[in-house]
Every structure is written in structure tokens, then in C-alpha cells.
């Protein structure tokens, strides 16, 4: 995917700088875990996941109905970010980890956790401003772990009044869930509208189990 990159210059990432970046339509990344430099990314084609168009396959619906995993919100933000960074190649370096942890303490960054017998086995985290949620990364230590986290998050965002789920890019995994690419101009128009309204991720309780998620399936209304 074509995108423009802007090298970061001092000062280092701060919560305020992150918020201003998101509101301007850009986001930070690092080349690798051990590379302390950060650059800003502005994709020409932006990935979004329409909250009224999330695709949940019949197979995944059956899994949601029978699994005994549990869900939680903001119980282990650092653990979720660490899980997302725990891979051979990652764009999450120490500077990014610290900045998002600080943003979480301010109430702007959030994580949804998936647990099996109390152990963290999947999750997703991102930033919420207005009615926009900027998805940063997700991880899975069990098959379907990240899918369950994503479906749960999308359902929760919609119930809480969010209108824009920014996935930044569209991976094959996200495409199967309904993510699409839109132009930079279209994205920024949607972003402006989302930033002009308000929503609260804690306005509604998060379902405790995947079986309680109101997730649409093929041929079913997305209500």
C-alpha cells in the first residue's frame, strides 16, 4: 500500500503529540523493536472496518457460542501491548510502548482482553477520540484469539455510539472481517465527522463472554 512517511524529530512521543497526530489523520510506527526512531504514517489508501458491516462467519459464530473464554476491558493494557509486540517483526518499540501506556492512563487508549482460565490469550488495543476508534494492533496465543477480540470490540464500539473504526491498513485477516480501503480524502472527511461528536467506551457494559456478543452472521441483520 502506498503511503507517505514523515520522520519524527524531537521531542519524543508524548500523549499530547499522539492525540494531535490522530486528529490530523496520521499515526506513528517504528521500523523495529530495537530501533528507537519513530516515523509518522499517512496512508494514501486508509483501512477502515465499517461497524455496521463486520463479517462474522458461521464457523466463528459457532466458536463464539461454545467457547468458555472470558472478555474484559482495560484490565491489562500493558499486557495486551506487550502481546502485540511479542513477534519476530514488530513496529512497537519502547518509545511507542511508553507513550501509549501514558495515553491509557489519561483515558484515551484502551485494550480489550481475551482470557482462557484467567490467562491472557488474545487482545486488541487502540485509541478513542470522539466517535472514532483507531485500532493499533492485536494478538493471539490461541486460534481465533484475535478474531474474538476484534468481533467483541466492534460490537462494543457500535453499542457505545462509535462511528469510525480506523484499521490503518487492510491485511488479509482484516479483509475477511469486512475491512475496506478508502481514499485519504474520504477518510479525513469521516474523521472530521467522528471528531465532532462524542462517545464513551465505558457507556455500556462489555459482555463477559463471547457467547453474549451480538455479532451479525451471514444473512442476519446487523442489529
Swiss-Prot record:
NCBIfam families per record: aat
GO cellular component: cytoplasm
Known catalytic reactions: N-terminal L-lysyl-[protein] + L-leucyl-tRNA(Leu) = N-terminal L-leucyl-L-lysyl-[protein] + tRNA(Leu) + H(+); N-terminal L-arginyl-[protein] + L-leucyl-tRNA(Leu) = N-terminal L-leucyl-L-arginyl-[protein] + tRNA(Leu) + H(+); L-phenylalanyl-tRNA(Phe) + an N-terminal L-alpha-aminoacyl-[protein] = an N-terminal L-phenylalanyl-L-alpha-aminoacyl-[protein] + tRNA(Phe)
GO molecular function per UniProt: leucyl-tRNA--protein transferase activity
Record carries keyword Glycosyltransferase: no
Name of the protein: Leucyl/phenylalanyl-tRNA--protein transferase
Assigned protein family: Belongs to the L/F-transferase family.
GO biological process, one term: protein catabolic process
Amino acid at each position: 500500500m502506498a503511503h507517505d512517511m514523515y520522520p519524527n524529530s524531537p521531542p519524543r512521543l508524548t500523549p499530547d503529540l499522539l492525540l494531535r497526530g490522530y486528529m490530523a489523520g496520521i499515526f506513528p510506527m517504528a521500523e523495529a523493536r530495537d530501533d528507537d526512531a519513530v516515523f509518522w504514517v499517512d496512508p494514501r489508501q486508509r483501512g477502515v472496518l465499517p461497524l455496521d458491516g463486520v463479517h462474522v462467519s458461521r464457523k466463528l459464530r459457532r466458536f463464539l457460542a461454545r467457547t468458555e473464554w472470558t472478555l474484559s476491558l482495560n484490565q491489562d493494557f500493558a499486557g495486551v501491548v506487550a502481546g502485540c509486540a511479542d513477534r519476530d517483526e514488530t513496529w512497537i518499540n519502547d518509545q511507542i510502548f511508553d507513550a501509549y501506556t501514558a495515553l491509557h492512563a489519561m483515558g484515551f487508549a484502551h485494550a480489550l482482553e481475551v482470557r482462557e482460565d484467567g490467562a491472557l490469550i488474545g487482545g486488541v488495543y487502540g485509541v478513542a477520540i470522539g466517535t472514532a476508534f483507531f485500532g493499533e494492533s492485536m494478538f493471539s496465543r490461541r486460534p481465533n484469539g484475535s478474531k474474538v477480540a476484534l468481533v467483541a470490540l466492534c460490537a462494543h464500539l457500535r453499542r457505545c455510539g462509535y462511528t469510525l473504526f480506523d484499521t490503518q491498513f487492510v491485511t488479509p485477516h482484516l479483509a475477511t472481517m469486512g475491512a475496506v480501503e478508502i481514499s485519504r480524502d474520504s477518510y479525513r472527511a469521516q474523521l472530521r465527522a467522528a471528531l465532532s461528536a462524542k462517545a464513551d467506551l465505558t457507556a455500556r457494559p462489555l459482555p463477559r463472554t463471547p457467547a453474549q456478543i451480538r455479532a451479525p452472521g451471514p444473512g442476519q441483520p446487523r442489529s
